[in-house]
Amino acid sequence: MKWLLLISLVALSECAIVKVPLVRKKSLRQNLIEHGLLNDFLKNQSPNPASKYFPQEPTVLATQSLKNYMDMEYFGTIGIGTPPQEFTVIFDTGSSNLWVPSVYCSSPACSNHNRFNPQESSTYQGTNRPVSIAYGTGSMTGILGYDTVQVGGIADTNQIFGLSETEPGSFLYYAPFDGILGLAYPQISASGATPVFDNMWNEGLVSQDLFSVYLSSDDQSGSVVMFGGIDSSYYSGNLNWVPVSVEGYWQITVDSVTMNGQAIACSDGCQAIVDTGTSLLAGPTNAIANIQSYIGASQNSYGQMVISCSAINSLPDIVFTINGIQYPLPPSAYILQSQQGCVSGFQGMNLPTASGELWILGDVFIRQYFAVFDRANNQVGLAPVA
């Protein structure tokens, strides 16, 4: 009888996990290259990827760089309204707002994407509260509204979200996503909007106050965001838990960054944000420049750090030690291969914090390590992908 009860509890736990599949598409960068627009984009955009993090007044204005999303390849589908209107979004642990284009937006970027129409939803409730998210060449401005958001099998009712009225530049016209679904803490949400996952938990729609992410390395499909639980089939060994050092982003403390047993950065410890909404692995400019030089990467006319694909067979691992556990990244992880050749998965940025230099552990890292974002205990769980 005890075994039957245990089996039933395990089955109940598995059923309680809501999985949202992510598909892999061409990135915004690749689309801009194919349309001959990347050089113009780079001329007009702020070169600082750090602009996404720590805005001056997060309750009023969230500052983000479009360049953070340029190499994103993983996207999921949500529905907003009754009946649901579908949108392709980035599930972004590095921001906290949900926003999508609306019919109020006539910018070129909006015209090429799905736009939310409040008049076609029987459950929409409008507000007169503005929202503004600043980018390098202008702002996404709009209004906040409430409606039911369908995420996987979850109907997240009375969810606040942004309806864009203007979107910056024509470059988002080629973006493979409609909007952003932020999964960071409410402390960094623009206009004080309650994030989607917080609302799910407050409404009792998930069984555990956590979500987890698996990013597939090579398949067009297979990647997934899981709400309310952990599926151990996606990782090997045990999850190692790392305390969140500052609630806002999913920020943790890193002990060191080494190569060939030698510290190449973060020798006295540093901070890192685990961010599904940043494709590359970003760190202090000087440290990244040294890494790029060591691995033989050089900048091309598109601003990418290109590298010989043969280097994958000869370069060493780069090892992040976090909470006493080593997390190696092999060259096959930090060198990104495509039909056009190979590029470095590292990106330089300067954003010192009160606790030391800051790194961003983006998709280059998460493809290697299954990640659990545990709000109940304010910790991140990491384990090698299966």
Swiss-Prot record:
Signal in keyword set: yes
Gene Ontology biological process: digestion; proteolysis
Compartments, as annotated in UniProt: Secreted
EC identifiers of the protein: 3.4.23.1
Propeptide: 16-60
One cellular component term from this protein's GO annotations in UniProt: extracellular region
Broad class of enzyme this protein falls into: hydrolase
Gene3D superfamilies: 6.10.140.60, Acid Proteases
PANTHER family for this protein: BETA-SITE APP-CLEAVING ENZYME, ISOFORM A-RELATED (PTHR47966), PEPSIN A-3-RELATED (PTHR47966:SF22)
Name of the protein: Pepsin A
Species this protein is from: Canis lupus familiaris (Dog)
Gene label: PGA
